[in-house]
Structures are given as structure tokens and as C-alpha cells.
Amino acid sequence: MNRKSQKEIQVTTHMVRQFLQENEDTGYRDFHSNLLPGVDNVMGIRLPVLRKFAKQLSGMDWQEWFEQADDQWYEETMLRGLVSAYAKMECKERLTYVAKFVPDVNNWAVCDCFCSTLKDADKYQIEYWDFIETYFTSNKEYEARFAAVMLLGHFVKREYLKESIRRLELSLIHIS
């Protein structure tokens, strides 16, 4: 029998939503929804479960799903961020996916979780430092938050300290 390799398996919206339905936890949904003001599309899947599934998806053919997803559920948005952060790829390609994803971030949980999962920001400091700069002056709340969380999560280092403070001040002035 000829089995497909993981990379040959096409991720689909149907596949993702079926997983979400199978792992829905209404008790957790009620709890988690209270932490997300203004977000009313929570199914209630715990983050460790989403992370495990995202790691599986990141080894498959996920790019078309990422591009075409309509993010009906909060967890779909979270998965798109996690998959793009976990997938093996060069820094330049990842930053392309990050740039596509950041405008879709619409709450603190997706923003903060996504930023903390972008582990290659520690390896490619210069590339990420340059990349996040424009987000500090964004008029969009979660784009500016993305920049601040990335800075605090990956750039609190002596060599970036002065410029980090300047960028955070710029961001505060811009959103005031």
C-alpha cells in the first residue's frame, strides 16, 4: 500500500473544523470567553491541544489553507498563527507569512501566543528587529501590540535596550 507522506496531506478547512468540533469543551469555552472581551466565536479548545494539532498540521501541505481560511472560529485564527510559527521554513519566507497573519489578529490571546511561538525571532534577531519596526506606528491596536509583545518577548537585551525604549515610546505616542 502506498501511503502519503505527511507533507503530501493537504490541510483543509473541513479537516480543521472537524478537529475543532471533536475537541470542543463547552465548560472551557465559557471560562475562556470571559477572558476575551468582544470575541464571541470561541469553541473552547485548550491551548495545549491546539499546539499539538498545529505541530501536526505544520508538517503537512498547509499553505493553501492558510491563505484561504476564513477564520470562522477564534481557534482557527489561533491555529493559522501557530502553524505558520511551527512550520519549517527560511526566515524570509516565515516573515512573509507573519506579514499576512498579523492583520488578522483581533485579540490579545492570539497576539501573545503567536509572538511567543515565533522562536526563530531569537535566531534571526536583525531580520525580526527590522520587520517589527513598522508595526510600532500602526493605527491598528493588535498590530501595535504585536510589535510590543515581540519586542518584550525577544529583544529585551542590552544591545536593543535604548532603541526598544524609543520604539515603545513611539508606539505610546502614536496610539494616544
Q: Which positions does each model-derived feature cover?
A:
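Alpha-helical scaffold domains
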Residues: 1-172, 176
